[in-house]
A protein has these predicted regions:
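Structured, basic alpha/beta domains of bacterial-type, RNA-associated proteins
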Residues: 2-108
């Protein structure tokens, strides 16, 4: 299993129930692809530096995921088909950080 830090951005106009549903669907996708979520954070609604798909803000979600290397491309393909997710980034890491991300510290 490969380790990834995974961030994805969701549309600003989602209701709280739609937002939760979109996150749960993405978590289910990861689990269906033989992956698991080791840690997750919700960074909340943030301003974007520039509009992305007509969104000036986005909800940011961060996850540490374990998923087989050969399945990460399949996950990315499913993310591309999801109209609620406007951008994502998955970075392969050797080990997960032990401390919360700076974005969570910023909220406090």
């Amino acid at each position: 299993m490969a380790l990834f830090e995974h961030v994805f951005m969701l549309r600003q106009d989602l209701s709280s129930t739609d937002l939760e549903s979109a996150i749960e669907n993405h978590e289910k996708t990861i689990n269906d692809l033989e992956g698991s979520i080791a840690y997750k954070e919700s960074w909340g609604l943030k301003n974007l530096s520039y509009p992305i798909k007509n969104n000036k803000k986005a909800f940011f979600e961060y996850m540490n995921i374990e998923i087989p290397n050969e399945r990460i491309q399949e996950m990315n393909s499913k993310l591309n088909l999801n109209e609620n997710i406007i951008r994502y980034l998955s970075i392969k890491v050797r080990k997960f950080e032990e401390t919360p991300s700076p974005m969570v510290k910023e909220k406090d």
